């Protein structure tokens, strides 16, 4: 890895972390459901799917931009650890239905958005 790629990842990560902070802060919890975490994971999945689609469909995306958006921005924007912690907290509070919905929503929605982003890049 060269310095340019490392700096692209660091800069993308900084923007992604700040975006996660603000988005999660705007939509923290709705009736015990962690909407903010679902939203940041969804946005990151859509962007990552779009980036992957661009590469798959033959668009030339420079390596530093792939690093900035893919590893940096999307990596810092999405948050598997917070998703896991919030799900564990819901289970600990015996909110079994909400915990199950949280798991299903995060997995199904984010995979669907990766696919949607992938298909959007085809245009």
Curated annotation (Swiss-Prot):
**Localisation per UniProt entry:** Cell membrane
Notes on how activity is controlled: Na(+) is not transported, but it plays an essential structural role and its presence is essential for fluoride channel function.
Q: Which reaction equations make up its catalytic activity?
A: fluoride(in) = fluoride(out)
Keywords (A to Z) from UniProt: Cell membrane, Ion channel, Ion transport, Membrane, Metal-binding, Sodium, Transmembrane, Transmembrane helix, Transport
Pfam families from the entry? CRCB (PF02537)
One Gene Ontology MF term: metal ion binding
What's the protein's topology in the membrane? Multi-pass membrane protein
The cellular component terms of Gene Ontology attached to this UniProt record, alphabetical and capped at eight, are: plasma membrane
Write out the similarity annotation. Belongs to the fluoride channel Fluc/FEX (TC 1.A.43) family.
Q: What is this protein called?
A: Fluoride-specific ion channel FluC
Which species is the source of this protein?
Thermococcus kodakarensis (strain ATCC BAA-918 / JCM 12380 / KOD1) (Pyrococcus kodakaraensis (strain KOD1))
């Amino acid at each position: 890895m060269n310095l340019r790629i490392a700096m692209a990842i660091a800069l993308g990560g900084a923007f992604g972390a700040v975006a996660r902070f603000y988005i999660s802060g705007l939509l923290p919890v709705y009736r015990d459901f962690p909407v903010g975490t679902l939203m940041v994971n969804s946005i990151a999945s859509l962007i990552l799917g779009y980036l992957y689609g661009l590469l798959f469909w033959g668009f030339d995306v420079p390596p530093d931009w792939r690093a900035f958006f893919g590893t940096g921005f999307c990596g810092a924007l999405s948050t598997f650890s917070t998703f896991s912690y919030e799900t564990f907290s819901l289970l600990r509070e015996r909110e079994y239905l909400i915990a199950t919905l949280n798991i299903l929503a995060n997995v199904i929605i984010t995979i669907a958005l990766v696919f949607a982003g992938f298909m959007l890049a085809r245009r």
